[in-house]
Amino acid sequence: MAGHSKWANIKHKKAAADAKRGKIWTRLIKEIQVAARLGGGDVNSNPRLRLAVDKAADANMPKDNVKRAIDRGVGGADGANYEEIRYEGYGISGAAIIVDTLTDNRTRTVAEVRHAFSKFGGNMGTDGSVAFMFDHVGQFLFAPGTSEDALMEAALEAGANDVNTNDDGSIEVLCDWQAFSAVKDALEAAGFKAELAEVTMKPQNEVEFTGDDAAKMQKLLDALENLDDVQDVYTNAVIVEE
């Protein structure tokens, strides 16, 4: 992507994630419970559970914690009343934002999400108001210096749809979200370990923010991320660090 470093953004994202690992574990436990409740406790026949368990491994969550979460989900304890709700809205300058939640109290959650938007210069939108600006995909990012030709060959053979080299030298691989686990396994078997591997809502176009606007936008994103019921926040805003 011209104008900003995809690699710097990913490193910042990983550092932020490491700083709040306890919160990430809490979110993953909820996701594992819900996935197991809806699709069963076998990762081989439950793609959503497989994805959640892989995320837990990447976050260094102990296997005992993962097993307990699966058992609770299958048994119907805890998590049984969690409801998946997506909220859409806008940040400053009309930046698009998607907020995915798992909640046992939608009245509380919508109030908290709306408050975060309004407090930091954004506003809630209606269902579908910004989702069309994103694609639901599997995304992998590899460090600058990775062999582009070898990675492209392995990725396309694994079932990826697209391979892009960014201006900073990092390489992005995209696939259908349903094929994420299969592509991830194939790439790792070929010797390619991604620095970032996730199923995400990828914006079709990005909007860069600098200076004061970047600081304001970051505050809004942080406020949404820090809500207990929020699982993921997606945006087409790119915060450019100067």
Swiss-Prot record:
GO terms for cellular component: cytosol. It comes from the Bacteria. Coiled coil: none annotated. The keyword Ribosomal protein does not apply. It is found in: Cytoplasm. The keyword Transcription regulation applies. Transmembrane segments: none annotated. One of its GO terms (molecular function) is DNA binding. Pfam families: TACO1_YebC_N, Transcrip_reg. GO terms for biological process: regulation of DNA-templated transcription. Belongs to the TACO1 family. This is Probable transcriptional regulatory protein Bcen2424_2294. It comes from Burkholderia cenocepacia (strain HI2424).
